Amino acid sequence: MSLAPTFAVIAAVLLGGSDFFAARSARSTPSLTVTRTAVAVSVLLSPLSLLVVESKWTARDSVIGALAGIAMITGLMLLYRGYKVAPMGVVAPIASVLLAAVPVVWDVINGVRTGPTVAVGMALGVVALVLTSYTPGGEGSATLGAALGLSSGIAFGVAFTLMGEVSKGAGMAPVIVQRSAGLVLLLVVWLVRRDPLIATGPGLRYGALAGVLGLTAIGHLQMAFQRGASGPVSVASSQFATVAVVLAVLFNKERMRWWQAMGVAATAVAVALIALGS
């Protein structure tokens, strides 16, 4: 059995944890400042990944890594903007589904075919994303929220697709470039907006934790893409939304709605099917 699903699931768990701590930090700190803090920490620590995984620097993989980093941060900024001006229940499901769908479409275009078990797992995984990320209520424009969710999901999907184009021998080198390019974009945004550069107090602590987990997650995600098809890996790793919901229920005492519970169960089955068929 391929190690790709294993790395993808580890990435999903770590991304969910990173998202959870970023949300904690955002209680006292602007979301872009939290993101900048987390990415800065990940950039500082990213060279350590070269000690763990044998890596090779190439111009092609470095360019792909930089483009993936820019796309990922663009997706985050569009997502946060969507959360600010529209109901989360509109923005999140659309972004989550497209995040997973874009790499699947790319696989189809390139003639990559999956077995029936993996295909069912991927379809169920997309359903699970909608169930776990949907929350009712909220204020703002549903139309604008849908547009921002759509653009955010496409940006994330492009980032994931680009990560799938990195050569296996590159190891963690593209991850370092990806994180660095993302930080450069965030610094450019800071020069324009002049919001707080780095989080302070509790926001700094939680933001730093989000950065550590985020870097580790992206490293595992890159290894997953280097070992498997983009579609199954993207669907399995995108289940981090489920992890974030479970952590919020366990530690923030948030209520899990019945459809979210169904989504959690669907996630478990979907990941199992993808792993069995890979």
What are these regions (language model features)?
Residues 33-37, 90-94, 116-119, 173-177, ...:
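Signature of the 12-TM Major Facilitator Superfamily
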Residues 40-46, 94-108, 181-185, 217-220, ...:
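Alpha-helical transmembrane segments of compact multi-pass small-molecule transporters, enriched
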Residues 7, 14, 21, 41, ...:
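Hydrophobic residues within membrane-embedded alpha-helical segments of Major Facilitator Superfamily
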Residues 79-117:
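Membrane-interface helix-loop-helix junctions at boundaries between adjacent transmembrane segments
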Residues 1-13, 17, 21-67, 76-86, ...:
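Membrane-interface interhelical linkers
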Residues 143-173:
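Selected transmembrane alpha-helices and immediately adjacent juxtamembrane segments
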Residues 1-15, 54-72, 111-127, 150, ...:
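Structural signature of hydrophobic alpha-helical transmembrane segments
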Residues 101-105, 114-134, 259-278:
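Hydrophobic transmembrane alpha-helices of multi-pass small-molecule transport proteins
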